[in-house]
Amino acid sequence: MNKRKFFVFMALIMSLSLAAVSWAAPAVDTVESPIFTKQIAAPVDEIDSLTLPDPATTGLQSRWAVVPVSLTQNRAGEWAWQSEIPFDSSERLSVMLLSPHADQWQVRVTAPGRTAAVPMDRHNGFRAAYHGAAYATAQFGLDHNQFPAELLTFERVPAGTWQVNITANNHLATRGQTVDGYLVLSGDSDYQIYTHLNSHELVVGQSIGLETFVFNAAEADGQQPQADPGLIGAATLRLTAPNGQVDTFPMQVNRDGRAVANFTVNEVGGYTAQVQVEGQTATGERFMRTSEHAFPVIAAAYRLNERVNQVRVIGQNRLELALPITAVSNQTPDVMLGAEVWGRNADGDMVPVTWVGGITSPAETRTGLYLPLNLDMRWLSLADTKPPYELRNIRLQDVDTQIPYATADSIRLVLPRSVETAVERMNVTAVNREMLMGPAPAADSITNNDNPASAYVGGSRLLLVHGYCSGGVWPTGHFSNYSVFQDFNQNRSHNQFAQLINSHGSQFDSFGIVAHSQGGAASLHLYTYYWSGLDWSNGNRLIQSVGTPYQGTSLAGMLAVLGDIFGAGCGTHWDLTYDGASLWLSGIPSWARSRVYYHTTSFSWAWWRYDYCSLATDMFLSDPEDGVVERWAGQLSGANNMGHKTGWCHTDSMRDPAQTHDYNRNVNMNANANR
């Protein structure tokens, strides 16, 4: 059995403010827990969903413009900034200021066709120079990673060039950055830009790029956007490296309407990128749009060699395939490994047999390093295939970002004659759990009951799990026989988060999960890749989630940009971007997804008012949404959709109540939960 055992140490500290929350439970004890990886597989009809995503399909649609504000001193001694911003929206326009010092700025906005500027009056709102103009404050962010914002809203104003003037008596340094803040304009125009990475191989030394184009959202009607040629006048890319260096690249505008800029990444760490597009709509109105992106670059680790150099039987029905690799540094990290197995059918055609994968550690023999990949021989019998066999679409990925270290189209797989004979004697007609997950370890081996220093409790529990950069969100009075997972106000990858949940859950013999936001994805990750108390639990629903961005959120990139001026806060999160989420989902089989029961929510609606969860995040999200997660991005294909409910928002800082406080839903989840 491919068993990897290590210890995860978790020290969780709860702040005094969070301890005062009425539903907070006692702090989690520090525990040590063994982790056993699963040897995962999937049937042939899932192979298409388990391929690496095309980055062209995981891009960001933008109807907004984010303009950097950099104050300079004028002759009068004032610090000032002025900009003219073309915008084609003619119905409703929102203007938002984001800066640590925005409350000390004097702001004047002149609408298209007007000569009188409208000053911001923070005590009385906007002076009524335009019908329906309003001033408001809000918070922009995700869970507790929030930044203060000021918003100006105009109704029924003409399209054209907006002029914004900002002055300040003093220049307050913003963390040594050249940018003091950001001005955001967002409207209701159908003309948007679609921007995507051209590669997910985000490894040091690689040349990657961003591609953008303008499209008409009304014509796209929810389908994959297509470029409208001739609308882009100019496009630029502003790239910020991990060391803070900022480079600006002109983007080449092609005849097909796509603008492209390529660059080489030479440093490990987090990058932010902003694409700015200016052009004219089909009716001749000038516009500006931007899109904001965050992505990590990882160090190179391995190269794949050309063939499987050893196949050995490691247990009843189990084979270990040794994939030879070459380490390109002195680091040999664990990897996510995935591959399709193909063989020849009775007609002589090569056909898929299964998809296999999981998290694995490199091993060493006299001939060098290899990665063990496990295959259940019963898949070969089920597919009724014979030699020759081969692996296709092989990928080695980083366990925390799912970024590919290396890929290969195909590798020849030669099985020993004894294995071929064993397969010929089989008559497998159905798939069982062991074929999908590998052999299970002993039930007591996944707890910490053999560690005298641990806080082993035993029994079964319902784990209440929070999300990214979050505190205690679940009112515990709505639940019974529960244990509160506490890793408050932290930024974890799905893999790190999953291991921490397992560490907490190892106090018990079995558990089910109710999770909020990222906690739902981390719980699914745990069930997919690791053996845990989830696998020995009983009940109607294994994992239940509320407000989980399974397909990502558009806020992730903007949060990274704001970190440059406000401070990092909880930091950027690749798994919560559209790109990172799609890479992660490409390794999650349907047998794991089918054990998830998910809920989505959005704001309440009334015909006579403008509806939202958060005024600030609404500028970046498509309706319906909960202030963080768009309804479409909260869907998990292959899982159980428990419905969409209005009148509930992502957190308690939004207009409608927090979705985790819904008593009726919580009581229902409690009654049906595994434990």
State what each model feature region is.
Residues W81, N216-F249, P333-W342, D349-V353, ...:
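Short flexible loop/turn segments that cap and initiate beta-strands
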Residues T115-D143, A234-T236, N243-R258, M350-D376:
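Solvent-exposed serine/threonine-rich low-complexity stretches and specific carbohydrate-binding patches
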Residues F126-G160, A168-S186:
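Beta-sandwich interaction modules
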Residues V204-Q223, A322-P324:
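Beta-strand-rich structural segments
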Residues P439-R675:
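Lipid deacylating catalytic domains
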